[in-house]
Regions:
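Cys-dependent protein tyrosine phosphatase-like superfamily
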Residues: 1-191
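A phosphate-binding catalytic loop at a beta-strand-loop-alpha-helix junction
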Residues: 188-201
Length: 201
């Protein structure tokens, strides 16, 4: 079964596809490309599992991911369609804007610093845009060396290691504020965003 809402599937209708479990796959036609779909897999009319595509193909947006579906230590599952991570929302195509709006995302939590931030397009229709800039002091030691072309082999690896340590130690306030926002039910769905969608997020 297919639905744009991962918590509501119309199982009274015919499923969009069926398959023998031994086949291992089935094909679902994608006729409406402006919507994100979730799928209810029903095994032998007894066992259900909700799944969805982890990565969303959005032109000019890096690393857009749905964080739903991961299992917790107590055997539960993070709900699909509630928390996303992403790169920055700049230079969007009309199709990408439509897809994002159709996901119903209410809150953008933006970890970019004022040095990086470009105002997010109002066309996306977020109710809340919350800027929680992370620490950028790790750049201070690197930029002068880049300007003088003094980088040596292995410096990039060391820089990335220092970067992640700096993010944890220097961005505690930003991450604390993020978790406080995650506690507000009216903020959902939420997207966590930074420049590339893979460091702070």
């Amino acid at each position: 079964y297919r639905s744009t809402d991962p918590e509501h599937f119309d199982t009274a209708k015919e499923p969009v596809a069926t398959a023998n479990i031994q086949t291992g796959y089935t094909v679902v036609p994608d006729s409406l490309q402006t919507y994100r779909y979730y799928f209810l897999l029903r095994f032998n009319d007894r066992y259900d599992r909700i799944v969805g595509p982890r990565a969303e193909r959005l032109k000019y947006i890096e690393n857009f991911r749905d964080l739903g579906g991961y299992e917790t230590k107590n055997g539960k599952q993070i709900r699909w369609g509630k928390i996303f991570r992403s790169g920055e929302f700049n230079s969007l195509t009309a199709n990408s804007i439509s897809r994002i709006k159709n996901m119903g995302i209410k809150t953008l939590i933006d970890f970019r610093d004022s040095e990086d931030i470009i105002k997010t397009s109002p066309e996306l229709g977020f109710d809340n845009v919350i800027n929680l800039p992370g620490s950028l002091h790790y750049r201070q030691n690197l930029l002068p060396r880049l300007e003088k072309e003094e980088l040596r082999r292995g410096d990039a690896n060391l820089f990335m290691q220092d970067l992640y340590v700096a993010m944890v130690s220097g961005s505690k306030r930003a991450f604390k504020s993020m978790f406080n926002q995650l506690l507000v039910e009216d903020n959902y769905p939420i997207v966590l965003s930074c420049i590339n969608g893979k460091d702070y997020t």
